[in-house]
């Protein structure tokens, strides 16, 4: 009997050790960000141009005939136990020529998960903004729904951000870092998928690699022209008003 209990104890120890070693603490994730251009451009024209409905219909028919439906771009998220760094896979990434909103096309987001400090680099037309503030706080509601993303079992969570915008996120609790793409964070594990249905935006992991990380930093952190998030939003609002671009989707996408 003593040998039986010893054997069971050893098996449990091995099992717990295997489970413990399966947790990922640092690595690199490749994300695909997709924007439905057909919907975004149609809403842009409706909100900013004042075209009659028939003209909008004809315009969009021509646009759809000559443009791909989705704008897809690729970003890498590097992470360890205390930091996440999200930036374009291609540092020379450009926005599509057939898309009217040259904003947020090569965002960079560095989050310090210990101090809850965030440093972001964002684009609006030909201007780049450098923003330093606390990380976004999101009130998530966890669900029981599960799905596989890039080989990881992920649990669904829902939230409202910017007062009324519905967000669906999927997180993997076997990746211990509580980060995610863009400024999304705050779930019990790494966020591998984000869907924003009303804004027609998705961000999903394509590959996840475990690897050791050196210190995660951005060279732009040393700049002096750094804004708070509130000041950044105020400047964006003023810029869009000057161009008569009171477009709600654009405001959200710039600050996402």
Q: What would you call each of these model-derived segments?
A:
Residues 1-24, 256:
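Bacterial Sec-dependent N-terminal signal peptides
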Residues 20-256:
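Extended soluble regions of mature proteins
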């Amino acid at each position: 009997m003593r040998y039986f209990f010893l054997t069971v104890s050893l098996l449990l120890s091995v099992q717990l050790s295997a489970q413990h070693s399966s947790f990922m603490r640092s690595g690199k994730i490749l994300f695909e960000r997709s924007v439905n251009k057909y919907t975004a451009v149609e809403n842009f024209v409706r909100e900013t141009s004042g075209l009659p409905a028939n003209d909008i219909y004809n315009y969009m028919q021509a646009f759809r005939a000559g443009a791909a439906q989705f704008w897809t771009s690729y970003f890498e998220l590097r992470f360890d136990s205390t930091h996440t760094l999200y930036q374009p896979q291609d540092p020379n990434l450009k926005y599509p020529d057939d898309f009217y909103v040259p904003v947020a096309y090569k965002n960079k987001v560095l989050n310090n998960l210990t101090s809850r400090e965030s440093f972001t680099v964002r684009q609006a037309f030909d201007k780049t903004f450098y923003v330093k503030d606390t990380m976004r706080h999101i009130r998530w509601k966890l669900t029981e729904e599960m799905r596989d993303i890039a080989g990881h079992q992920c649990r669904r969570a829902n939230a409202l951000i910017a007062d009324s915008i519905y967000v669906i996120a999927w997180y993997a609790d076997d990746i211990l870092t509580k980060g995610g793409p863009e400024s999304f964070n705050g779930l019990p594990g790494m966020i591998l998928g984000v869907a924003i249905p009303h804004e027609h935006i998705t961000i999903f992991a394509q590959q996840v690699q475990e690897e050791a990380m050196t210190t995660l930093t951005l060279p732009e952190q040393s700049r002096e022209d750094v804004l708070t998030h509130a000041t950044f939003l105020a400047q964006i609002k003023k810029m869009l008003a000057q161009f008569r671009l009171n477009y709600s989707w654009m405001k959200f996408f710039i600050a996402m």
